[in-house]
Design a protein with these regions (language model features):
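Glycine-rich phosphate-binding/hydrolytic loop that grips phosphoryl groups
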Residues: 1-7, 66-71, 78, 83, ...
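Short beta-strand segments
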Residues: 33-41, 45, 85-86, 266
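Active-site nucleophile and cofactor-binding loops and adjacent substrate-binding regions
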Residues: 36-38, 56-61, 174, 206, ...
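Glycine-rich phosphate-binding loop plus the immediately following alpha-helix
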Residues: 3-7, 48-106, 121-126
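Intrinsically disordered, low-complexity domain-flanking/linker segments in eukaryotic proteins
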Residues: 10-26, 131-160, 255-282
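Adenine-nucleotide phosphate-binding core of ATP-dependent small-molecule kinases
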Residues: 109-196, 203-207
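Glycine-rich, charge-dense phosphate/pyrophosphate-binding loop(s)
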Residues: 190-200, 210-221, 229
């Protein structure tokens, strides 16, 4: 990560709904910082110097959790398919919001009506309402209702569409996992007095909703005092690290195409193909 931060132009950026992408200039005073690497699980690394680091925390709820649960819930087969579904989904049809509970913002504790109060909360609410309706109309207790529900479920599945769309479920679960990671990352940064938080790993994949959720979580829990930083090549930290460990000659931007190289005749050669490199954020059509 040090290499990406200090050597690669237009590599590190912040993200928000108002100022979607803002590139950070490379800097030399990068330590200390927290690296949140999100793959199948999540590891959080405190980096204090070029060769000084320690794993300070993490969580088992990561990309593997999203993939595993969505493959069971909606039959998605690939991670990109799940992200595409999440793009089209509406989590408010699945999640219970503050506005669903109070009817408006809860200003006393600073919660907007659009804040998620309970991930998948409307699923539970619908189940409870169905149970009460069955008890009131058929005189069934909970045990009898559940037994009858399981008996009738096969017939109802034939005649009725699922109450929750696959896209809505995908978006809700993506938000749940991303928000959880963001909150834990903030808590670790507070515990270890770290003001800079970088997010990496193949879970992110340049996905706009994932990046926005992680960024919002850090901003929310820190009351705007901290930012989440992201990388254009977030999925290649391990590969580039293994490459650099071999200490290749002339590594870094020295003699790179980005700065121009000098050929045997002493002429500077520039590579104009590097001009339009942008982060691979998924757009709305993904």
């Amino acid at each position: 990560l040090d290499f990406f931060i200090t050597e690669i132009p237009e590599e590190v950026f912040t993200y928000s709904e108002s100022d979607q992408m803002h590139f950070e200039a490379p800097r030399s005073d990068i330590y200390p910082y927290l690296l949140v690497n999100i793959g199948s699980g999540v590891s959080m690394i405190k980096v204090s110097g070029p060769r000084t680091y320690e794993r300070v925390g993490g969580t088992s709820l990561g990309g593997g959790t999203l993939w595993g649960l969505l493959s069971l819930l909606n039959g998605s087969r690939t991670f990109d398919e799940m992200l595409a579904l999440a793009e089209r989904g509406d989590n408010t049809k699945v999640d219970m919001l503050v506005g669903d509970i109070y009817g408006t913002d809860y200003g006393k504790i600073g919660l907007k009506s659009s804040t998620i109060a309970s991930s998948f909360g409307k699923v539970f609410k619908m189940k409870r309402e169905a149970e009460r309706e069955a008890e009131d109309s058929g005189g069934l207790n909970n045990k009898d209702y559940l037994s009858e529900f399981s008996t009738l479920s096969s017939d109802s599945e034939i005649n009725k569409s699922p109450p929750f769309a696959a896209a809505d479920i995908s978006r809700s679960l993506l938000y749940a996992i991303s928000n959880n990671i963001g909150q834990i990352a903030y808590l670790q940064s507070e515990k270890h007095s770290l003001s800079t938080i970088y997010f990496g790993g193949s879970f992110i994949r340049g996905h706009r909703q994932t990046i926005n959720t992680l960024s919002y979580a850090i901003k929310f829990w820190s009351n705007g005092q901290k930012k989440a930083y992201f990388l254009r090549h977030e999925g290649f930290l391990g590969a580039v690290g293994a490459f650099l460990k071999r200490q290749p000659l002339n590594w870094g931007r020295r003699n790179s195409f980005g700065d121009g190289i000098v050929n045997s005749l002493g002429n500077t050669i520039r590579d104009d193909t590097q001009k339009d490199l942008k982060p691979a954020l998924h757009n709305e059509s993904t």
